């Protein structure tokens, strides 16, 4: 109830803030200027400089458990899977082929982020957004310690965030121009960005679909320019998840079932660990069929919703369960 109340209050505050901002007007040009290389280079350079200082200070960066899992795939210890987006794993593998050091992956990641910051500043400058607004946004994106910290890890979340930042700037450009900026080259670029957003996180497809729907709803008169971008996004996504993944022998995610019922299974595991007497015989029989109670006690972390996912490969998939068997 407390968390729900906080979430509701935060949502209400956001909605009220958005409503209040309706009266705030920015002077936007009727037509965009030519790309502003000076603004792009200054913003990207500043972001890259800040990131370089952080990387040197915390050299060679950090690895999360997700990244360790991906590196084991790259090293051949385990087969490539799409548990963590395989495209991101393949990108890391390609970079490590060039320079076999994790800091190189982080350096490229920081460069990509700096380019996204520079592109965002360039879009705002081309539409003559006030300089102080561009300065504040660039400073926030470059100096925010939370962003600097997470960018020191080669997480899929970082790659996804970079793609989303590019997408946000592209959508602003489309919005300000009412779709007129969608040249063939920019349609290709927008489609590629939408595809990357859909692939680099398993739930990123929701954002890509929402962005595509917004484009069609907000600019129905420009559907002839929008549809090619959406078609490119679909074809690119299918091409990567299909032929490309097949060429590299990417195993389809075997734990999609686990993703579906991981939360209720975690709740049951917590109860089975802490208060098994409160479960009825049918539930106990099901849990014992998956694994003996000693396994739950050994591996369970009370309140950790990720627990079932992390141990799925070694514990919970010794039997070929289906959704009907689980829920039936």
Show where each model-derived region lies.
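Aromatic- and kink-enriched transmembrane "portal" helix at the membrane-lumen/periplasm boundary
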Residues: 1, 59, 86-89, 98-102, ...
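Transmembrane-helix motifs of polytopic, lipid-linked glycan transferases
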Residues: 107-128, 166
């Amino acid at each position: 109830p407390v968390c729900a109340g906080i979430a509701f209050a935060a949502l209400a505050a956001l909605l009220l803030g958005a409503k209040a901002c309706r009266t705030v007007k920015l002077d936007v040009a009727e037509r965009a200027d030519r790309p502003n290389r000076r603004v792009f280079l200054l913003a990207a350079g500043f972001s890259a400089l800040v990131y370089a200082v952080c990387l040197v200070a915390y050299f060679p960066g950090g690895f999360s458990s997700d990244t360790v899992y991906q590196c084991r795939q790259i090293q051949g210890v385990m087969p490539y899977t799409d548990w963590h987006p395989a495209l991101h794993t393949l990108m890391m593998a390609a970079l490590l082929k060039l320079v076999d050091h994790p800091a190189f992956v982080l350096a490229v990641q920081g460069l990509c982020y700096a380019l996204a910051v520079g592109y965002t500043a360039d879009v705002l400058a081309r539409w003559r957004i006030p300089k102080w607004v561009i300065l504040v946004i660039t400073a926030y994106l470059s100096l925010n310690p939370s962003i600097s910290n997470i960018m020191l890890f080669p997480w899929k979340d970082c790659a996804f965030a970079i793609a989303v930042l590019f997408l946000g700037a592209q959508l602003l450009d489309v919005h300000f121009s009412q779709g007129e900026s969608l040249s063939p080259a920019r349609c290709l670029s927008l489609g590629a960005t939408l595809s990357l957003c859909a692939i680099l996180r398993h739930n990123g497809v929701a954002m890509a679909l929402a962005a595509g729907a917004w484009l069609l709803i907000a600019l129905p008169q420009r559907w002839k320019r929008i549809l090619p971008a959406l078609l490119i996004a679909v074809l690119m996504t299918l091409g990567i998840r299909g032929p490309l993944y097949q060429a590299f022998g990417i195993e389809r995610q075997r734990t999609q079932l686990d993703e579906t019922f991981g939360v209720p299974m975690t709740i049951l595991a917590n109860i089975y660990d802490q208060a098994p007497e409160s479960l009825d015989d049918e539930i106990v029989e099901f849990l014992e069929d998956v694994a003996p109670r000693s396994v739950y006690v050994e591996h369970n972390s009370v309140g950790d919703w990720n627990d079932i996912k992390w141990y799925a490969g070694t514990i919970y998939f010794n039997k070929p369960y289906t959704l009907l068997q689980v829920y039936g």
